């Protein structure tokens, strides 16, 4: 009886995962659009606005990391399995963490030139890769639910 309940709970969690993954697709697109505008805002002297937006984007990407971990566990995806080109869940999470630290350090040191470069080259790249990895996870979800 207990095993049956656990299976039902797990199946329910998997079913609820789909809408969350689709919502995250939209959020990642929104993050990408916002990141593309940040360097221009920096150059226009709107540092406070950029830093505020960057905090919101980082919080959203932190939520993405949590969702990705949960989805991988629920869908039995090995964290070391390559889901997009040579990117696995584990590698993407490490890359995001490393780039978050670089962005935080640049912001703390008020190195806005470096911060702009990190946004343009690293963060935008991370978001694009995150979108592709999420697409792979969503396909796995759809295969499992069907």
Task: Give names to the regions the model predicted.
Residues 1-146:
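C-terminal-biased regions
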């Amino acid at each position: 009886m207990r095993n049956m309940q656990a299976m039902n709970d797990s199946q329910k969690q998997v079913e609820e995962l789909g809408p969350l993954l689709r919502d995250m697709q939209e959020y990642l697109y929104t993050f990408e659009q916002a990141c593309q505008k940040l360097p221009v805002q920096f150059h226009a002297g709107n540092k406070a606005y950029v830093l505020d937006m960057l905090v919101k984007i980082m919080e959203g990407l932190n939520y993405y990391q949590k969702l990705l971990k949960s989805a991988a566990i629920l869908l039995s995806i090995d964290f070391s399995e390559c889901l997009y080109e040579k990117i696995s869940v584990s590698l993407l999470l490490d890359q995001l963490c490393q780039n978050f630290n670089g962005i935080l350090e640049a912001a703390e040191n008020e190195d806005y030139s470096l911060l702009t470069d990190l946004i343009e080259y690293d963060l935008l790249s991370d978001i694009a890769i995150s979108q592709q990895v999420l697409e792979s996870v969503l396909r796995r979800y759809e295969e499992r639910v069907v």
